Amino acid sequence: MKYVDEFRDGATARQLAARIAAEADPKRQYRLMEFCGGHTHAIFRYGIPDLLPANVRLIHGPGCPVCVMPIGRLDMAIELARRPGVILCTYGDMLRVPASGRVSLLKARAEGAAVRMLYSPIEALKLAQDNPDRDVVFFAIGFETTTPPTALVIEQAQRLGLKNFSVFCNHVLTPAAMHAILATPEARAGTLQLDGFIGPAHVSTVIGSDAYAPFPRQYGTPLVIAGFEPLDLLQALLMLVRQLNEGRAEVENQFTRAVTAGGNLKAKALTGRIFELRESFEWRGLGALPNSALRIREAFAEFDAERRFALEARSGLENKACECPAILRGAKSPRDCKLFGNPCSPDNPLGSCMVSSEGACAAWYAYGRQRQAVVAVAR
């Protein structure tokens, strides 16, 4: 398959791995964070850690939108779903994330709440059209990749004159989280040291490579945008190793077949018409971050579920035994959590990092648990 098979060639992968091993300075460490949850799974799926020298360490970041959703926002969604006359719909992973008291949207549905799973925001619009006597609320989550489809359905709802459709907006912004990672207590104390970023793929197709320019300039941290295939990731790692060896800190784009400097201008314009920055938004593991999320503009306030239903902010309590917040900051790995594997598993998730298909714990469970000893050496 074009643009797939040629990026999975085993011989080329071994050559790239050999170059990384040859060029990595044995006298120093290379601590590199992949921000994207899709990258995390690709790294384990293709056994990338097993190909790297011991001093090239991969650290998982907060690039999973389900994982970074704070419990308080999930509590608000559950409260909304339980209201008479409301149908709440969202993506499948969100249904299983435990909120306060280990209640999830799935459990709320079992107790009688009208909760629906969907694959696309357009399904929520259709649901509102088919149920004119019910208030249909789309629980919107995700980074810049999933924001334009939400903006589109809000615009369409206004055009159609739908009065029973609204959006509970929880769209968050990638650069803000990356800034926060470099300013966490662990980073300030030196217990979390990051030498470079593997930039996200899908997000970068929307926001473009220019969006990351502040990181080398402000923090001296290099960043290489990478695709999802094994050769993409290995080439990006080699590019980061070379930048660090040469004392450079730049934004480089390995994923040139999909990412441009300016990104998707139409998608960004659509997002800008419908949404504006929130002053602050709570992230699981990172706390309240300024200008890190979006809200619906006043011109589209009738489609804002928070305004329509006068939702009040909540502060949920984390499971104290769950290390998901520290894992999202890159301060710990899944194997550091005493709940990992037993009792916490994809069938019985106790934290969001095990629920989502993009979560670090789910990746470890699916691909890495049987190789923990090997991966531990690489770390």
Swiss-Prot record:
Per the UniProt record, the source organism is: Azotobacter vinelandii
Q: Which PANTHER family match?
A: HYDROGENASE MATURATION FACTOR HYPD (PTHR30149:SF0), HYDROGENASE PROTEIN ASSEMBLY PROTEIN HYPD (PTHR30149)
Described function: Involved in the maturation of [NiFe] hydrogenases. Involved in the biosynthesis of the Fe(CN)(2)CO cofactor.
Q: Name one GO biological process term.
A: protein maturation
Gene3D superfamilies in UniProt: 6.10.20.100, HypD, alpha/beta domain 2
The protein's name in its UniProt record: Hydrogenase maturation factor HypD
- What family name appears in the similarity comment? Belongs to the HypD family.
**Which key words tag this protein in UniProt?**
4Fe-4S, Iron, Iron-sulfur, Metal-binding
